[in-house]
Amino acid sequence: MIHQYRLNGYNIVLDTFSGSVHVVDDMSYDAIALLDAGKPREEVRRTLSANIDRYNSLIPAGEERYTEGDPEQILREIEELTKAGKLFSKDIYEPKAFDFKKRSTVVKALCLHVAHTCNLNCSYCFAAQGKFHGKAGLMSFETGKRALDFLVENSGTRHNLEVDFFGGEPLMNFDVCKQLVAYARSIEKEHDKHFRFTLTTNGIGITDEVIEWANRECYNVVLSLDGRKEVNDRFRKDINGKGSYDTIVPKFQKLVKARGGKNYYMRGTFTHYNPDFTKDLFHMADDLGFTQLSMEPVVAKPGDPAALTKEDLEIVFQQYEILAKDMIRREKEGHPITFYHYMIDLTGGPCVYKRISGCGSGTEYMAVTPWGDLYPCHQFVGDESYKLGDIWHGVTNIALRDEFKLCNVYARPDCKDCWAKLYCSGGCAANAYHATGDIHGVYRDGCEVFRKRIECALMIKAAERDL
C-alpha cells in the first residue's frame, strides 16, 4: 500500500507495510503513482518521456534538468526498491492478527483513579468534574496497595510497570499517592520490578512538597493548561467560577524549572472556540517557556457548544501544518519544541503486535476506581457494562476482556484501505465506542485528524535531513 502527498515543498511517498518513507523528485513521484494505479511499465515510461519538458519547467534555474534516459533510470530504481521490500511491499501484519485471542494477559500498566473529585469545575470535562457520572470518592491506601499487588501478580516477567495517578484531581489525595509510591519502592527488589509513575494534574494543588516529590518519584508529569489565558479560563474554572490560569501557570513554571525542563508535557484541549490552537501552543512556548507540548481535540457530543464542527476541522488541519513548519524553523534556530503527536520513530518503533493493537486497553492496561473496580481504561469508567472485575478477584468478565483482545486494526473493516493503520493501530476503542456504540467501530473525524498529524510528522522527518 502506497500513500503519496506533497507538503512544504516535499514530495513524500510512504510504503505502508515496510514503513519506508521516500522523498522523491516530481518525475519519480508521478511514476510511483502511475504504477500504483496499475499502469504497465512501458506505458509509464512513455508517459514520463512525453512530459519531460513539463517536468523541466518546474525545476528552478541553475539546477540539473531531466534527460531522455531519466524515465528508464527512475523505473529501474523503483524496481530495485520494490525488490528490497521498500516499495509496494506486502502486508506481513494481517496473519499476526489472528493470534490475538490466544495472546497472554500480562498487565503492564494501571491508571489509578486516586480521586473521583476535583477542585476545578471544567464544563467540557468528559469525567463529569472528576466524578465519572457517579459519586465522589478518594482511594484509600489499602485499595491502592491492593491495586499495586494486583499489577505485580498479573505482570508476568515484565520488569517495568507503569502507574498513572489520575482523577479527578489526584493531588486531592496526595498523602495516599506518597504512601503508594513508598510501598511500590519497598516491593520492587523482591519481585524484580521497577515502577514508573506518572502524575496528571490540573496544578491547583501543587506545592513545594509536591514539586520535590514529583520530580523525585515521577518519570513523567502531565500538566493541564489550554494555552492563552482567555482560552484556558473559558472552561477551566474553579468551583466559584474563577479562571485557573493565574493560579496554575506560576506553579507549572516552578515545577518544570525544578525538573530541569525534562519529562513533562503541557497537555491542552482545543474546542470550537479555539480551532486556531497553534496560538495557544506558541503562547505556552514563547511567553511561558514550556517546550514539551501536547494539544488534544475536545471529547464532546455533537451539538455541544464546545464540539468541533466540520468547518473547524479544516482550520485544525491548517493549524497542524502551521505547527509543523514552525517546529522546523525553531529547530534550525536552535530553540526546538516537542509536540507529542509528531513524535515518530522511523528506525525502530513499536513491535509487530503493538503496531496492530495499540494501547492494550482492557488487556495490558486497565483503570482502577477509588473502590477497586477494573475498567478497560479511564474513558469507560462509570459504564457498568464495561466493568472487567475488581482488584481482589481479578478480571471476571472474561468475555469482555476477550473482546478487547480482538481490538486491532484488522478487526475494523473500515481500516482495511487506510494507509495510516499501522500508526494508529486501529485507533482508540473508547472513541470508537462513544462515536459508534461499538469498540470495533471507527471515529471518522478522529481518523482525519490522526492522518493529518502523521503526514506532518513525516514531513518534519524529511525536513530534518536538510537541517
Language-model segments: what does each one mean?
Residues 66-69, 73-212, 217:
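Conserved alpha-helical substructure of the radical SAM core
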Residues 125-131, 261, 419-420, 433:
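Detector for the c-type heme attachment site
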Residues 148-166, 404, 442-467:
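Short Fe-S-cluster ligation motifs
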Residues 314-348, 378-425:
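C-terminal accessory region of radical SAM enzymes
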